[in-house]
Amino acid sequence: MNQQQIDEMYMRRCLQLARNGMQNAKPNPMVGAVIVVPSPYRGETEGGSIIGEGYHVRCGEGHAEVNAFASVRPEDEHLLKDATIYVSLEPCAHYGKTPPCCDLIIRKGVKRCVVGCVDPFAKVQGRGIQIIREAGIEVTVGVLEKECQQLNKRFFTYHQHHRPYILLKWAQTANGFIDDHGQALALSTPYTKMLVHKLRSEYDAILVGRVTDEREHPQLNVREWYGKDPVRIVLGKNTQGESSTSSPLWGNREGLQSLMVEGGRQTLQSFIDAGLWDEIRIETSPKTVTGGTSAPQLPVGIQLQQEQFVDGNIIRTYRK
């Protein structure tokens, strides 16, 4: 393997570790870190050997780098001078609930630092990388960059666009209706329903329109997966009777990094028409009805990102 392939291999491990923080790291990003020493120290493994690894378990506790260094055995500490630390997100450079990770990396004296992507948080934004480089440590940035950014898509959207990452989600019949002449339809299978609850556990808030709330009284909580219930939001009407998608809810001050919209057609279409979406998830059942409410109209030129066949249903995902 060449160096790029080695770097990508260990960055994939960082991403794998980072995902373990999905539930408890919020509102912090998910981050994984791996410490690697050259092959001669640990047999003949091509590309080196891991002597430490960790991930950000819970907001307010040690970051991935802290946990990775803590996992290094005392008898391996002397190897750090020749080690490379891989981190899926730029090491922090500020004092928050924990000290700066860039200072820890410098203090441990590693030879090289490989970073997946730059942290968009205003107090970091390249400062961690700069500090580490100024200390004489070699830094490589941008290894599996898109994958690292995608892992924390909600965190990135919140800090770059000052609004939540917005997922629009609905289920429809094979002939494009979301209800049966105004009556609710059971279109998900037990398994795809579980997937929806898993999604809910990953989002900070979930929103429906007033009409859906009054007609269906949805619980909008997490029942068939584990994790916290999202904040429940019912989108009301302003004085002109229009959907209030310009509400201060979308402001940075609310602290919501992600929002799932499960409303009826009017609510979903208002988000689409306003361009307030990042991802659209549509579950299509093989069932058909003779009439009802038509599914929302997708934006012109939208690109399909993923298509899954699950229990006879088709789940399509679109992203901007």
What feature does the model see in each segment?
Residues 32:
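Helix-turn-helix
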Residues 124-125, 151-152, 219, 290:
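Short Asp/Glu-rich motifs
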Residues 142-159:
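Short, structured interface segments
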Residues 35-147, 231, 270-272:
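Zn2+-dependent cytidine deaminase-like catalytic core
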Residues 2-29, 52, 76, 97, ...:
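Enzymes that bind and transform nitrogen-containing heteroaromatic metabolites
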